[in-house]
Every structure is written in C-alpha cells, then in structure tokens.
Regions:
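Short, surface-exposed interaction patches in beta-rich subdomains
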Residues: 163-251
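Conserved acidic catalytic centers in enzymes
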Residues: 47, 139, 219
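Acidic (Asp/Glu) and glycine-rich low-complexity loops/linkers
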Residues: 2-12, 22-117, 121-136, 147-156, ...
Length: 251
C-alpha cells in the first residue's frame, strides 16, 4: 500500500510538471511588436489575419502573434497606403493554421479607403469620421464598422464575404454586391442611397431618415429595406426579391 501511494504521488508530480511546462511554453510563444509609420489614409489587406483599426492622432501598427510566425507578415507604407500581406513563400496550409494566431492593431488620423482581399478580417470598433470612405471586400473575409460619419461612402463586395456597418451617417451612399456575400447596414441618415445587387447575395439596409433610394437587383439575391424614406425607385431582373414590407415612405 505504501509503494502504491508513492507511485501515485510520483505520477501526479510528473503530470503537474508537464502541464506547467506546456502552459509556460504556450505563453512564451506570444510576442508583440509595435512601430510608428508614415502618414497613411488607405489600408490594403491581403493576408488571412484580423486587423483592428482605431482613428487616432498617430500612424502606427502593432502585431501580436506567435514567435514562429514572426517575419511572415509584410507591412509596407508608401504613398498614403498601408499594405499588409504575407510572405509569398509561406505555404497556404500554414497561413490557414496561423490565421487565428495573428492580431494586427492599426491607428491612423484619417481613413478614406479599406480593401480586404481573401479570408481576413477588418474590425473598426470606434467612430470613423471622414469626408469620403470606400470599403472594398474581394473574397470570403469579414469587414465590420461600428460607427461611420462621412459625406460619401462606397461599399463594394465581390465574393462570399460579409460587410456590416452598425451605424452610418452620410449624405450619399453607394452599395454594390456581386456574388453570394452579405451586406448589412443601419443608416441613421442619408440624402441619397444607390443599391446594386448582382448575384445570389443579400443586402439588408435599415434607414432612419432617407431622402431618395435607388435600388436595382439582377439575379437570385434578396434586398430587404426597412425604416423610413421619402422616395423609392426599384428595378428587378431575375428570381430575386426586393422586400419593402418594413419600409415606410413619407407622404
């Protein structure tokens, strides 16, 4: 019985040492690098990473990832454009495995353009104030804006990805979807809103106070409009549907 107790105790100590070693190893793998950048107002992402954006006083980038992924991210800033990409020699299966291990934090005083190519993510959790803003997604990635104030905005989606804007205040908006993706916008105010859907995707826009809405659908996709607007002009070709049951037009 005494030998059995000693054996159990020894086994527990060994297991505890292994678990402790694994925990320390996992923590030590993570590394953070931060640096200042020249002024930029456009961001182009062609890497399967998650990019967080905050509008602030300085231009900077911070990368949080694992040691084994250091050097895989290529960042270039020139002509007012910040480009974030992967080293082309890295194999795709490694990139897919690394996607959830990499967080990129970007700060800039201005933002007039965001382009996401592929399966990455772009998240803006704060307010973005700009005269003009163009959002482009080509691929299966995700773009999320919490709050946007601008004069003119263009939202373009080509592919199967998702674009979501929780709060939008603008004078003129252009929303274009070509593919099977989804666009969802909550528009607090807009003077004119132009919508074009070609494909099997879905566009959902809620208007708090819109003046004129021009809507065109070609394909099997669906457009759902809700809220309040003054005028609505709609055209449809294909098996898709333009749902205006929740849209109230001012008299």
């Amino acid at each position: 019985m005494k030998r059995r107790k000693v054996l159990i105790f020894t086994t527990m100590v060994a297991v505890g040492f292994i678990v402790s070693s694994c925990f320390k190893s996992t923590r030590s793998e993570f590394r953070s690098t931060e640096e200042k950048l020249p002024y930029f107002n456009k961001i182009v992402i062609s890497a399967p990473v998650r990019v967080h954006f905050i509008q602030g006083d300085k231009s900077s980038i911070k990368i949080v990832n694992k040691n084994k992924h250091q050097g895989q991210i290529i960042k270039e800033c020139h002509g007012g454009v910040l480009e974030i990409s992967w080293n082309s020699v890295i194999k795709w299966n490694i990139l897919k495995k690394s996607e959830k291990d990499v967080e990129v934090y970007v700060t800039s005083p201005d933002l007039i353009g965001v382009t996401l190519k592929g399966s990455g993510e772009f998240i803006s959790s704060g307010k973005v104030d700009s005269d003009n803003l163009e959002i482009t997604l080509a691929g299966s990635g995700d773009i999320l804006f919490t709050d946007i104030i601008c004069d003119k905005i263009k939202t373009n989606l080509r592919g199967s990805g998702d674009i979501k804007i929780n709060n939008l205040q603008c004078l003129h908006s252009e929303t274009t979807l070509m593919g099977s993706g989804d666009i969802k916008i909550n528009s607090e105010s807009s003077t004119t809103s132009d919508i074009l859907l070609k494909g099997s995707g879905d566009i959902e826009i809620n208007y708090n106070n819109a003046n004129a809405i021009n809507c065109k659908l070609e394909g099997s996709g669906d457009i759902e409009l809700s809220g309040m607007a003054k005028t609505l002009n709609k055209q449809k070709r294909g098996s898709g549907d333009i749902d205006i049951n929740k849209l109230r037009l001012k008299q």
